[in-house]
A protein has these predicted regions:
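Extended substrate/RNA-proximal surfaces in nucleic-acid metabolism proteins
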Residues: 47-181
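Structural recognition of alpha->loop->beta junctions
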Residues: 95-100, 140-141, 204-217, 234-249
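Glycine/small-residue-rich hydrophobic helix-like segments
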Residues: 175-223
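Conserved, mostly hydrophobic/aromatic
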Residues: 5, 25, 37, 101, ...
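An N-terminally biased module of ancient metal coordination in phosphate/nucleic-acid-related enzymes
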Residues: 1-83, 92-97, 154, 159-165, ...
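Structural preference for beta-strand elements that scaffold enzyme active sites
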Residues: 1-3, 32-34, 72-76, 99-102, ...
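Short acidic/histidine-rich active-site segments
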Residues: 38, 148, 214-230, 250-253
């Protein structure tokens, strides 16, 4: 089992140390873990200025040495809005032996998604979100799209479940652009912890992705504490098999490798 979305105390909202996360991963049967610490370069974002790349690198080296016979450890980043301020992001990537980058949209119009959607109808909120995601995928440097339809985490209680058909053209454009740039999709199991009670992205989007020829998938728990490592990943593997996918992907130095499921 691979968990490719995790946060330690190197992220502003992480609650467990890297050592604690590794120990939990081993107990839960995770064979490979990728730490994807938050990176934001926009002042006002709660992540801004938090990540110390030198300290992060030292912790990775320490845990790789300590758990080398029990756990494969990869070094990643989750970059918020990677298409913005790309010159500011570059120093965090260059010279730091990054294995994997998740590109996510956490903010829109310089507002947190929970603030952005206030007072908006569902169609306006989701259209704005998917347009920003398209810009991110078109311009940003990433290996996978993080939690593709994340907005539903915040919008579900306000606007209910969204209809994919209302945004089908935009979603298709995002997926086609991702495939053309060799960018994969992350399946994020934290959706099971939200009111929507479904993964990010939904199965409908995964089916679209497969029909368009997409293959690259990673699966992550979005753990922010040790007790959440690996949560709901085995049933997602089963679902992927049922959808016709045969592999998930591992990354080393930004290069993907298929791993049978």
């Amino acid at each position: 089992m691979l968990d490719y979305h995790t946060h330690t105390t190197h992220s502003w909202d992480g609650m467990s140390s890297m050592d604690e996360m590794c120990q939990s991963a081993i107990v839960k049967g995770v064979s490979e873990i990728c730490f994807t610490e938050h990176l934001a370069v926009r002042e006002g974002d709660p992540c801004y200025g938090w990540l110390d790349m030198d300290a992060y690198g030292k912790d990775i080296a320490k845990c790789r040495n300590k758990f080398k016979d029990k756990l494969i450890i990869k070094k990643g980043l989750e970059i918020g809005e990677p298409h913005l301020s790309m010159n500011k992001i570059e120093p965090y990537k260059s010279g730091h032996d990054i294995d994997f980058i998740i590109g996510s949209v956490h903010n829109l119009e310089e507002e947190d998604l929970t603030v952005y959607m206030q007072g908006k109808e569902q169609i306006e909120s989701y259209t704005g979100y998917f347009r920003e995601l398209l810009a991110s995928v078109s311009q940003g440097d990433m290996d996978v799209i993080g939690h593709f339809d994340l907005l539903k985490r915040y919008a579900f209680d306000v606007n209910g479940r969204y209809r994919h058909s209302d945004y089908e053209e935009l979603i298709h454009e995002i997926l086609k652009t991702a495939i053309s740039r060799n960018i994969g999709l992350e399946i994020n199991t934290s959706g099971f912890r939200s009111s929507s009670l479904e993964i990010f992205p939904s199965q409908i989007i995964l089916k679209m992705y497969k029909e368009l020829g997409g293959e690259i998938l990673t699966v992550g728990s979005d753990s922010h504490s040790a007790n959440m490592i690996g949560n709901n990943i085995p049933p997602v593997y089963l679902m992927l098999k049922q959808l016709g996918f045969k592999s998930v992907f591992s990354y080393t130095q930004r290069k993907p490798s298929a791993v049978d499921i």
